[in-house]
Amino acid sequence: YEIRLSLVGSEMCIRDRPWAAYLLSALPFFTLALASYYKVQLRGDPVLATDLRLIRTAGGIMGNYTFEISAPVIVVLEGFVLMLVLSCLMLRKERMSPRSRLAGIMLMLSVTLACYFELYTSSSIYKETANNDLISPWSAVEVYISRGTTYPFLHSVQDMFPEPPEGYRESEAKQILEQYADTDIPDDQKITVVGIMLEAFSDLSDFPQLNEISAVRNLYEPLHELESRSVSGNLLTNIFAGGTTNTEWGFLTGYSQHEEFRGPINSYVRYFKDQGYDALYRHPGYSWFYNRSNVNEYLGFDECVFNESGFGDLISIEDALFKSDTVLVDYLLNDIDSRTEDDDSLFLFSVSYQNHGPYSSETYWEEYVTPAKTGWSMESCCVINNYLAGIRSTIEQMRRLTRELEARDEPIVLVLFGDHKPWMGNGSSVYAEMGVDLDVSTQEGFYNYFSTPYLIYANKAAKESLGQDFRGDGGDISPCFLMDKLFFECGWTGDGFMQLQRETRAVTPLMHEDGYRMVDGSITLDVPPDVAEICRRYLCAQYYREQHFVSES
């Protein structure tokens, strides 16, 4: 309220018009409230200050969603208009001298700045405003909403700027990393590495409600067969129903937490390049989405192909939502086959676009669930059927890819993983109707909310070249540990940071942004002191590596 009153006062001093002061002061907060409301409905998380960096990305996908004008929105709209009318009719226009006007503006600015830096950024005050008796303290969304919209948004502004982990000392972090020497990939083991992050890829047969349906079990059976011939497990992501680059960049950098990168960054892409690899990136979507065109350059990729620079000639962006995996697999195979013996080794990474939400709730093209069989609404059944139809196609194409790789004499290892659970209705309505537990304070709810599949597959030539079996349970890990897991299965040591990761992963394979760790197989926020110290050292070393770019290893 202090900030809002200061803005109103400033506008009064500038314009002498109460209605204009109200309108220009209320409109930003009204817009923020609506944006946060709909983001929670569509994505399951509120608007934070860091989202301002992604306004263009958000604008590009808004047309895909349906914005329901609900009763709360109508009430807020009516209140906004009513207050504007009252300010026009009941508040008098006051003339002010230039000196009074300037003094008023300076006073309001002083109040605004004082309130922000003394109150809104205070962690202690923020903790004191907790409403844990009324909400689930483990739900970041409920914690945010319980404080309104303006206050938590302004409090999040400081998160736009990097803040070191608790107990961070640069000299200590540097010393931690210096304990590990970078190790090269042996020349005779520099095989082709292919990585594919699959859009909203999730094994919904993990839910008993769907696993008891034979059509759903049959759909996922080819995936399970492929997993049985690979190293496989669950990826415990930081995100739900969106925010795909969190998982993507976690894999490519090894960082357990990160924002959008703004300059050259140490990454595993650069490690591959230092080892003499060519690093290529492929995505059938737009390059501006999540600012990938710039970020991929910061990560160190040699070449990137997006919709605008290649895929658009093969498939329209509209069709890419439904059937671009076939095109993507063909493109990747061509990348592999066009190499010659004189070319460098290849790191080929791609992000799929097929099956990006939302999914239609009005009609469907393939039938897996029906209201008659499940008791669920037709709208929910449509969403589920349309999602599963896309998954069926994706699984078919990934199996085709593995067959093609197996037929080649070139040694190739492939890592597949999902970025996040799929969108399933505004406010996760479809999950709720199915009875899926999304309470992350429980082990079951945490997995239901955050887990996606991953697998590491190698063709016969790669198994022979590396002397590894590439089969078995890979365990459940955070995205930041997936590249390390890939290197471990290949028998490679990796750089110094990866070696630190491997030691940390042995203690807790989960490094979640919200502080969750996995200790002796249990997910917990109550971390034993010895594990907490290992995590602190890891986070400090990670922060140091992120902040100190080294162009060449």
Task: Please tell me what each predicted stretch does.
Residues 1-9, 14:
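Single conserved hydrophobic/aromatic residue that forms the stacking wall/gate
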Residues 178-188, 195-198, 203-553:
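Solvent-exposed soluble domains appended to multi-pass membrane proteins
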Residues 17-25:
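Membrane-interfacial loop-to-transmembrane alpha-helix junctions, especially the N-terminal start
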